[in-house]
């Protein structure tokens, strides 16, 4: 399971749409998203409530504690919202040790309220943990002893009896409405493959539950069965403060288009030990698996090699190719893609004084290793080739010794 955070705007959109479908509960929530490209005149035309109601505006950037950080404005009209956004859009802020500009806001109706409730659902290995409190809001952590929690195993449904411990201390007249709401939210959680969902707080407006602040995470491995029919045009933003380089973005796009797994993250662009499977002065994390075809591996390897050979400084560098023993990835086929890329980058490899260490096992590995040995002699680039008899730690040690040796 890959837990991916989604924006509050999308969390509320999904909840509103599917809570009605699954539980017959029609949430009266409204929200609008504002970015650099937003035309406020057009936005108000599309959502007229923005010009008739008092509003709340806050960043929608996957970080919490917005209220405590002074990033939430309450009881504004649309002109004040526009000014608030203008003053902060693109401005860098620091949250949790990460710095990044604010690029996305959510605008909602201002809802005066007295009571704040807390609700969270977390997917666990054998089921789900559901937590509820009558003391929600920004002080929830200080009142965690008042949170009630149940665990619901995967095979058990959310029945009134299962929900009862969560709402046992509520006034009798509130238990039915809030209990039905919790059961409905849990149905949405399961049906849409949420892995985490939190409302802190939600309140009651005109007798109906109303989420004020919400966070959500989806299991993106469920995209094949839910993305089109249920998630709609969902966005999985990068974590706050994380920006993809052009090379990382290329591999990310390649990964999105294949059933295989292709990952690449630059950790230290000036490092001298580079990997083409799992990250090794280590400069990158890189991984390919799931039987990518030769063309996909070729494109992937080009990116890694361009990064690994950039800005030669006269010092030796090392490239680790391979990894563990493959289960079903055809080593011969994937190595063919890598070999094509190595041939293309021959001059860059030599300029960077690259030493290559290969270790691989699995289907057709003998063919792949034989091709690599032949390539070393043809290119005049040092390539040491090992099969499953060698260890990954062994070639890592060789790579470290190589780059640390005197030039």
Curated annotation (Swiss-Prot):
GO CC annotation terms, alphabetical: cytosol
Catalytic activity field: oxaloacetate + acetyl-CoA + ADP + phosphate = citrate + ATP + CoA
Keyword flag Transport: no
Family matches, as Pfam families: Citrate_bind, Citrate_synth_N
Class of enzymatic activity (EC top level): transferase
Enzyme Commission number: 2.3.3.8
GO molecular function: ATP binding; ATP citrate synthase activity
Keywords, sorted A to Z: Acyltransferase, ATP-binding, Cytoplasm, Lipid biosynthesis, Lipid metabolism, Nucleotide-binding, Transferase
Superkingdom field: Eukaryota
Compartments, as annotated in UniProt: Cytoplasm, Cytosol
Protein's UniProt keywords contain Nucleotide-binding: yes
Residue positions binding citrate: 327, 329, 360
Coiled-coil ranges (or none): none
Biological-process GO terms, alphabetical: lipid metabolic process
Gene3D superfamilies: 3.30.470.110, Succinyl-CoA synthetase domains
Record InterPro entries: Citrate-bd, Citrate_synth_N, Succinyl-CoA_synth-like
Family indicated by similarity: Belongs to the succinate/malate CoA ligase beta subunit family.
PANTHER family: SUCCINATE--COA LIGASE [GDP-FORMING] SUBUNIT BETA, MITOCHONDRIAL, SUCCINYL-COA SYNTHETASE BETA CHAIN
Its job: ATP citrate-lyase is the primary enzyme responsible for the synthesis of cytosolic acetyl-CoA, used for the elongation of fatty acids and biosynthesis of isoprenoids, flavonoids and malonated derivatives. May supply substrate to the cytosolic acetyl-CoA carboxylase, which generates the malonyl-CoA used for the synthesis of a multitude of compounds, including very long chain fatty acids and flavonoids. In contrast to all known animal ACL enzymes having a homomeric structure, plant ACLs are composed of alpha and beta chains.
Subunit field text: Heterooctamer of 4 alpha and 4 beta chains.
Name used for this protein in its record: ATP-citrate synthase subunit alpha chain protein 1
Organism: Oryza sativa subsp. japonica (Rice)
Taxonomic lineage: Eukaryota, Viridiplantae, Streptophyta, Embryophyta, Tracheophyta
């Amino acid at each position: 399971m890959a837990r991916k955070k989604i924006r509050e705007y999308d969390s509320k959109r999904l909840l509103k749409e599917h809570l009605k479908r699954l539980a017959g509960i029609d949430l009266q929530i409204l929200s609008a998203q504002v970015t650099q490209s937003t035309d406020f005149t057009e936005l108000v035309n599309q959502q007229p409530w923005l010009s008739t109601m008092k509003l709340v505006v806050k960043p929608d950037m996957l970080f919490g504690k917005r209220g405590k950080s002074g990033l939430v404005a309450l009881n504004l009209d649309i002109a004040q919202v526009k000014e608030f956004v203008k003053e902060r859009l693109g401005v860098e802020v620091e949250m949790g040790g990460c710095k990044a500009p604010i690029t996305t806001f959510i605008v909602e109706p201002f809802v005066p309220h007295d009571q704040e409730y807390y609700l969270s659902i977390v997917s666990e290995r054998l089921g789900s943990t559901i937590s509820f409190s009558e003391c929600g809001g920004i002080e929830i952590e200080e009142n965690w002893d008042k949170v009630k929690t149940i665990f619901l195993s995967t095979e058990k449904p959310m029945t009134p009896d299962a929900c009862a411990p969560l709402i046992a201390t509520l006034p009798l007249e509130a238990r039915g409405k809030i209990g039905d709401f919790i059961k409905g939210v849990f149905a949405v959680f399961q049906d849409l493959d949420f892995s985490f969902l939190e409302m802190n707080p939600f309140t009651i407006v005109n007798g109906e539950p109303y989420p004020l602040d919400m966070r959500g995470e989806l299991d993106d491995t469920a995209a094949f069965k839910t993305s089109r029919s249920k998630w709609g045009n969902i966005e999985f933003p990068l974590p706050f403060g994380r920006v993809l380089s052009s090379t990382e973005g290329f591999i990310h796009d390649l990964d999105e288009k294949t059933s295989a797994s292709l990952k690449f993250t630059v950790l230290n662009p000036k490092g001298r030990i580079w990997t083409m499977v799992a990250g090794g002065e280590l400069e990158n994390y890189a991984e390919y698996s799931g039987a990518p075809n030769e063309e996909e591996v070729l494109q992937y390897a080009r990116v890694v090699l361009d990064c690994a050979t950039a800005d030669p400084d006269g010092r030796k560098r090392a490239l680790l190719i391979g990894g563990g023993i493959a289960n079903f990835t055809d080593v011969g086929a994937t190595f063919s893609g890598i070999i094509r890329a190595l041939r293309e980058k021959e001059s860059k490899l030599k300029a960077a004084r690259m030493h290559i260490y290969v270790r691989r096992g699995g289907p057709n590995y003998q063919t792949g290793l034989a091709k690599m040995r032949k390539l070393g002699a043809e290119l005049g680039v040092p390539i040491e080739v090992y099969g499953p008899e060698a260890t990954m730690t062994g070639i890592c040690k060789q790579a470290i010794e190589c780059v640390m040796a005197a030039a």
